[in-house]
C-alpha cells in the first residue's frame, strides 16, 4: 500500500560501486516517506534487497550498446507505467540513457546520476564524442542530473551537456556502521606495521577528478585538526 509516500523507481544496470551507492541510499531513505522500486540488470541479486525495497524487478540490461536496448526501453516504459512513480531515478550512463528515452512523455520527475561520466573514461576520441552526444541529447529528457563531485559538475559544463541549473552536486555518503568495529582496525594496523598511536586516513578509489581526491584530502585535514 502506498500510504501517500513518495514513490521512487530506481533503474540500474551496473553493479559494483553503483550498487553500493544504491544499497546505502535505500538503507537510509526514510521508509515512512519513501517507497522504493528497483528495476535492475541480471547482475543484481534479489535477496540482497530484502527489507530495502518495496518491489524488485529484473530485466535484461546489457552494458554494451546493441539491439537489445530497444527491448530494455520497452520493458522499462512498461514498468514505469505499471508503478506510476513520482520520481524515476536512473543510475549510471547506460541505464541513464535508456531510462530517459523510456520515460519520455510520462508524468513524473526524472533524475539521472551518471556516477562518473562515460566520456571521461579512457576510450577513443570517436567513442568520447559519441558518449558526449548521447549525454547532451538525453539531458533534454530529465529534470535533474546528480553529480557526485564538483569536478563532475564542471566536466558537464565544459562539455556543454546541459544548463547549469539542471546540475546538482550531492556528495556520496559513507556508511560509518561498516567501520565502527575497532577490532578490524587493530588487525590492519598490525598487518601493515602501523603504530597504535598513528593517525591514519585512507581512501579507496581511482586518483581521478571523478573520485574527487582533493575533497578527501581537505576532509582528512579537518578530521585530524
Predicted regions located by residue number:
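A short, active-site helix/loop in glycosyltransferases that binds the activated sugar's phosphate group
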Residues: 141-166, 174-178
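A conserved mid-protein helix/loop that constitutes part of the nucleotide-sugar donor-binding site
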Residues: 19-24, 199, 203-222
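N-terminal strand-loop element at the rim of the active site
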Residues: 6-72, 151-155, 160, 166-169
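Active-site proximal beta-strand in glycosyltransferases
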Residues: 7-9, 104-120, 135, 146
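Conserved donor-binding loops in enzymes that form glycosidic bonds
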Residues: 12-15, 172-173, 203-209
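Short His-centered aromatic/hydrophobic patch
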Residues: 90-96, 114
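Nucleotide-sugar donor phosphate/pyrophosphate-binding loop at the beta->alpha transition
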Residues: 67-74, 109-111, 119-141, 154-158
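A short helix/loop element that forms part of the nucleotide-sugar donor recognition site in Leloir-type
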Residues: 75, 180-194
Amino acid at each position: 500500500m502506498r500510504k501517500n509516500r513518495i514513490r521512487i523507481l530506481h533503474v540500474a544496470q551496473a553493479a559494483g560501486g553503483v550498487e553500493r551507492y544504491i544499497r546505502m541510499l535505500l538503507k537510509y531513505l526514510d521508509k515512512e516517506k519513501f517507497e522504493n522500486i528497483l528495476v535492475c540488470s541480471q547482475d543484481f541479486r534479489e535477496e540482497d534487497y530484502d527489507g530495502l525495497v518495496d518491489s524488485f524487478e529484473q530485466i535484461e540490461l546489457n552494458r554494451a550498446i546493441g539491439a537489445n536496448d530497444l527491448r530494455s526501453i520497452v520493458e522499462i516504459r512498461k514498468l514505469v507505467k505499471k508503478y506510476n512513480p513520482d520520481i524515476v531515478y536512473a543510475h549510471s550512463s547506460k541505464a541513464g540513457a535508456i531510462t530517459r528515452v523510456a520515460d519520455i512523455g510520462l508524468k513524473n520527475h526524472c533524475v539521472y546520476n551518471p556516477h562518473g561520466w562515460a566520456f571521461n573514461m579512457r576510450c577513443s576520441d570517436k567513442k568520447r564524442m559519441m558518449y558526449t552526444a548521447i549525454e547532451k541529447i538525453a539531458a533534454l529528457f530529465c529534470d535533474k542530473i546528480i553529480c557526485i563531485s564538483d569536478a563532475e559538475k564542471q566536466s558537464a559544463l565544459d562539455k556543454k551537456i546541459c544548463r547549469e541549473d539542471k546540475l546538482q552536486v550531492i556528495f556520496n555518503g559513507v556508511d560509518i556502521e561498516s567501520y565502527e568495529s575497532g577490532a578490524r582496525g587493530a588487525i590492519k594496523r598490525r598487518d601493515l606495521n602501523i603504530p597504535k598511536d598513528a593517525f591514519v586516513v585512507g581512501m579507496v578509489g581511482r586518483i581521478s577528478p571523478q573520485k574527487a581526491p582533493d575533497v578527501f584530502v581537505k576532509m582528512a585535514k579537518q578530521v585530524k585538526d
